[in-house]
Structures are given as C-alpha cells and as structure tokens.
C-alpha cells in the first residue's frame, strides 16, 4: 500500500494546492500556499512563474517522507509563459484573465468562419483575448525581442514540468483551440501567426509519464503529463461517467457535462474526446473572485460575508448583481462586459449587497449551464460539485435554488488535485480506467435540494438577469472606451 501513494498538484489561479492520497482515497497530507498576482494596468494580469515552481518544490520537501508511486499535475490554462532555449521565462506569465490581446483576438477571429471553427473544434468557439494564438500575436507585435528569443510558449503545468524534469512537453486538452478532435495541432490555426508552430511543445497523452524529478526532494519519482485544471477537476468530480453534470467553483465558475453527442452551440466549448470521455464546458470569468472583490471593497472578511448572507433573506431590498468584473467568458465571450448592482434602494444594506453577489455568481453559472445543456443534449437531475465555493452551505443552497437541481458536493479534497491523482493512478497502472479510479478515490457529502418556492422566485429574476446582461453590454463597452481615453490623457 505504501508504494501506491500518489501526489496530486493543482497550480491554480491563486495558489498551489497538493495532497497525498492512498489507493483507497484517504488523504494523508495536504499543502496549500498562495502566491501574488500583479495588475499593472486595466488589462494586464501577470504572475511570476518561479512562484509556482518554488511552491511545488516546497510541497515535495514536506511530502518527502512518504513513498510515492507517481505525481499528477494540473494547472490553470490560457495562462502563457514565453520560455527561452535554456528553459527560463523571458517575462511574467500572462494570466488567463489578462485582456491585452483583445484587438489581436478580434482580428484573428474575423479571419475564421463559423464553419471553419465547427470543423476544427466541433462548436463555433471564438478566438478571445486568452487564446494562445492571440497572445503570440500580441508578443510578436509588441515585444519582438522576447518573441525572437522564445523557444516554447508554455502553460503553467508544462513550465513546472520542464523545471522539474528537464523535458518539454504538453498535452492536447490543455491546448484547447489549438488541437483538433484527433488530439493533434491544427496547422491552419498555428499558421495564423508566423512562427507559432515552431514554438509549441510536443504533445503527449494526459496519462503518459512525462519524465522523472531530476534532483532534490523525491528525485526519480515519475510525473504524469496531466492536463488543465478544469478538465482534471471535472473528471475528479465525476465527469468520467457519460451524461454527468459537474460544477466547479473557484476563482471562476466552470460548468461541464459529459456527453458523446454534440449539438453545435454558440458559447460552449467541447473538449476533444480522450479515453472515451467527451466534455462540454462553459467556464465563466468570475466566481469566487467576485466574493473576494466584495470582501476587499467592503472591508468585511469572507467568513463574515458568509455569516451575513446566512442571516439575510432575499427581499425587496436585495439588488441584482452582474458579476462580470473582468469581462466574461462562457457563454458571452465578451472581454468588455463589466459588473453592476441593479435595483439598489434606500433600504439596501451591506447584507443585501453581499447576498446579491452570491446570487449573481449563481445566475452566471445558470446561464453557462443552460448553454452546455443544449450543446450536450443532456438535462441531469443531479449536479456533482467541487471547489472552494462549495464550502459555504448557504452559497451551495442558493445555487441549488437558482439552478433548480439537486446538488452533491465533493469532500475528498480539491477537484483539480483529485483529478491529477486520478491521472497519476491510471498512468502508473494503479487503477485501470477513469471510472474505476474515481469510484475508489472520490467521496461526496449529502445532497442539497432546491426549495420549490425559492426556485420559482429565482426563475423570474433569472429572466431579468439575462436581459440585464444584454442591456449592459453596450454600456460597458462605452464606459471602457471612455475610461481608457481618460487614462491615456
């Protein structure tokens, strides 16, 4: 049993999370440590890649007393590091929330028809400001010295893998938008930016051993390639089973459905099928980050915010919150959307605003979920949920009411960490397939059931939410243009 312990790492948006699991799913040790994000302007969001590597090595030293069979790794994606031939980052990592490449994205997207997108990706997925090809276009244009020195354009887990093993590789799923249904790079996409194809790392399977730790703590321990945190988290929460619905809540909200059927739907993402699993996904731009923002501007702790919402009922003083603080991904894919409180009255107090934040995030998740229900042609009667946003009983119940669906929550660790462990278990033969591994390793809490009366009220408010998002789109764009002009002056 000792030789069958596994470590899962999740290099997330705000922290490195890790855990040691035994074969039965018992968590023997955990590690979580935050790192900073820099915002040097209204569109720039950056991180230091060395923070990720430093914290992974720190966790490995802490876990070093265990006998580890293998390590699995997942990470945030659409965060890009431009790396030289010696394996060193040439500049800060451009985080997925960064919008500097919005103009390049719009220009590239205009060059591709919806028919081409469906042929490449199965759905008319847009090229947005977080797309790798848009980022490469921006760097090539604005930082030609960095572009000329770039050997690899890497994702966080792949950069960490390079530093730990000395080998450059990546996986197909993490490169959504660059690969086709056969899990190969799409030459026509890479050709949109001259030199892009030569800067992509070799593709290997998500369960393939990418290399072994070359020095330091746990030297010689194999590391499985792994994949993006969203896909790992969706599988870790139960997405390996066909027609299952998954909801991950972290910095942002990610909705997913496993389905072999594809109905091309604007706003949805369909990951290439791997190991027989085909996931439809709708990642939003804001989730737990909206709660963090409100905590910071209001001066109340996030724990106090949760207690405040628990003691507050929805009523006439509760406004509607649009959580698009830094644009929106699914289903709108609009970097210019901004947040708002609507319906604030003289009776509205801080607790009402806090409740509105919880509800607004859930409304955005509801709209995202409806998009992939259509894409996957699936309507589940239960949603398996995981991530930090589901630690709040009150917020979980609000979500159940707004989604009007039963919810069960994962209690066996962070979804991404568990997903990475599942990949390591399959890669080393400890478990034979995803469903077997998930059954052995995952544990759930009791279900949350929607309150029929609350669900009915929220259904009416959701219709207003959708109209408000549409009405706010032009206003947001006009405000951004004005603010950018004023900042330049």
Regions found by a protein language model. Give the residues of each.
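A short helix-loop
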Residues: 119-122, 140-143, 162-167, 187-192, ...
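Acidic, glycine/GT-rich loop-and beta-edge segments that sit at the periphery of enzyme/chaperone cores
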Residues: 297, 429-489
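Active-site phosphate-binding/coordination module
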Residues: 56, 61-133
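Activation-segment/catalytic-loop signature of the eukaryotic protein kinase fold
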Residues: 315-409
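Glycine-rich phosphate-binding/hydrolytic loop that grips phosphoryl groups
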Residues: 106, 229-236, 282-285, 291-295, ...
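N-terminal glycine/serine-rich phosphate-binding loop of ATP-dependent small-molecule kinases
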Residues: 1-91, 149, 217-225, 403-407, ...
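ATP-dependent carbohydrate kinase catalytic cores
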Residues: 177-275, 286, 390-394, 399
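Gly/Ser/Thr-rich active-site cleft segment
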Residues: 11-13, 118-228, 326, 354
């Amino acid at each position: 049993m000792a030789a069958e312990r596994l470590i899962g790492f999740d290099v997330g948006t705000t922290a490195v999370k890790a855990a040691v699991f035994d074969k039965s799913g018992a968590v023997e040790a955990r590690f979580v440590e935050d790192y900073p994000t820099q915002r040097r302007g209204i569109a720039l969001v950056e991180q230091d890649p060395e923070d990720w590597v430093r914290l992974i090595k720190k966790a490995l030293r802490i876990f070093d007393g265990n006998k580890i069979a293998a390590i699995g790794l997942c990470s945030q994606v659409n965060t890009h590091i431009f790396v030289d031939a010696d394996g060193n980052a040439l500049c800060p990592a451009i985080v997925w929330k960064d919008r500097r490449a919005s103009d390049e994205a719009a220009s590239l997207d205009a060059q591709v028809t919806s028919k081409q997108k469906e042929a490449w990706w199965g759905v008319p997925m847009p090229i947005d400001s977080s797309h790798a090809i848009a980022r490469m276009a921006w760097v090539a244009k604005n930082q030609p010295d960095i572009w000329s020195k770039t050997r690899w354009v890497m994702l966080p887990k792949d950069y960490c893998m390079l530093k730990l093993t000395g080998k450059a590789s990546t996986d197909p799923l993490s490169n959504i938008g660059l690969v086709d249904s056969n899990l190969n790079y799409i030459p026509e996409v890479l050709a949109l930016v001259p030199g892009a194809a030569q800067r992509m790392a070799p593709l290997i399977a998500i369960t393939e051993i990418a290399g072994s730790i070359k020095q330091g703590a746990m030297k010689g321990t194999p590391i499985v390639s792994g994949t993006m945190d969203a896909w790992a988290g969706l599988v870790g929460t139960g997405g390996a089973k066909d027609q299952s619905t998954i909801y991950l809540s972290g910095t942002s909200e990610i909705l997913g459905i496993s389905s072999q059927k594809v109905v091309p739907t604007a706003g949805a993402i369909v990951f290439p099928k791997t190991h027989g699993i085909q996931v439809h996904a709708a990642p939003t731009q804001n989730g737990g980050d909206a709660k963090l923002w409100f905590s910071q501007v209001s001066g109340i702790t996030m724990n106090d915010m949760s207690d405040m919402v628990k003691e507050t009922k929805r009523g006439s003083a509760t406004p509607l919150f649009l959580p698009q603080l830094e644009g929106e991904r699914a289903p709108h894919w609009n970097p210019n959307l901004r947040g708002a409180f609507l319906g604030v009255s003289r009776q509205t107090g801080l607790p009402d605003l806090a409740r509105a934040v919880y509800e607004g995030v859930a409304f955005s998740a509801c709209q995202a979920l409806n998009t992939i229900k259509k894409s996957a042609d699936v309507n589940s009667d239960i949603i398996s949920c995981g991530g930090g946003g589901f630690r709040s009983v009150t917020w979980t119940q609000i979500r159940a009411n707004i989604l009007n669906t039963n919810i069960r929550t994962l209690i066996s660790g962070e979804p991404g960490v568990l997903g990475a462990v599942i990949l390591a278990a399959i890669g080393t033969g400890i478990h034979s397939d995803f469903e077997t591994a998930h059954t052995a390793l995952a544990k759930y809490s009791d279900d949350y059931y929607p309150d029929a009366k609350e669900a009915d009220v929220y259904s009416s408010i959701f219709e207003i939410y959708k109209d408000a998002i549409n009405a706010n789109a032009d206003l947001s764009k006009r405000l951004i243009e004005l603010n950018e002009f004023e900042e330049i002056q």
